[in-house]
């Protein structure tokens, strides 16, 4: 497979995505991060090769995945998402090999589904979403664009999560709950 990929953001979330992307068949060419981090290694063999100002340089060569985390506010992730799209870039959808996504589920562009997550039949996950480790998204649940469903959260059947929502670690939403717009 060996699809070329550049990660945008060099913090902890980046470290979590690297192995998932490798196993999913991506060849990571490098990481874009802050100017002061250019040349630094995020993990052995994975260097910061530039900043998000370099996105237009790579749009014809690679796909991108946003690896800036989101806990308090998704604004940085949204700005980077828009910057990639405005430059004509393509955002990869990365699903870890240990995750299970039903063939009847829908996953939006730029979304990352990490290890041991489960997305059940008829679930819909929007664009640029983080589905973190051990998350369970049950049948007919809907996750809006630009969300972060944190480690171990359980989103039960027919729940609706609006856009730009953070669901914290180990949160449990009972069936048919709506959170956010």
Protein language model features and the residues they cover:
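Short alpha-helical
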Residues: 12-13, 72-75, 106
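Phosphate-bearing ligand-interacting subdomains
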Residues: 39-100
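Hydrophobic, well-ordered beta-alpha structural blocks that scaffold small-molecule cofactor pockets
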Residues: 1-43, 49-51, 56-57
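A general structural motif
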Residues: 2-3, 28, 59-61, 88, ...
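Short amphipathic alpha-helical segments
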Residues: 18-20, 77-80, 125
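Alpha-helical elements of the RecA-like P-loop NTPase motor core of helicases
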Residues: 15-19, 75, 145
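Structural signal for interior beta-strand "rungs" in well-ordered beta-sheet cores
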Residues: 93-181
């Amino acid at each position: 497979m060996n699809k070329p990929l550049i990660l945008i953001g060099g913090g902890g979330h980046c470290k979590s995505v690297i192995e998932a992307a490798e196993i999913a068949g991506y060849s990571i060419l490098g990481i874009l991060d802050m100017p002061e981090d250019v040349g630094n290694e995020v993990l052995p063999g994975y260097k910061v090769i530039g900043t998000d100002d370099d996105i237009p340089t790579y749009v014809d060569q690679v796909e991108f995945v946003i690896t800036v985390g989101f806990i308090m506010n998704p604004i940085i992730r949204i700005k980077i998402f828009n910057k990639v799209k405005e430059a004509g870039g393509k955002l990869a959808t990365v699903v870890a090999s240990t995750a299970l996504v039903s063939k009847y589920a829908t996953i939006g562009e730029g979304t990352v589904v990490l290890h041991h997550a489960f997305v059940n039949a008829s679930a819909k996950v929007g664009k640029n979403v983080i589905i973190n480790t051990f998350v369970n998204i049950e049948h007919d649940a809907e996750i809006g664009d630009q969300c972060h469903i944190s480690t171990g959260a359980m989103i039960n059947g027919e729940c609706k999560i609006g856009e730009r929502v953070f669901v914290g670690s180990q949160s449990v939403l009972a069936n048919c709950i709506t959170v956010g717009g």
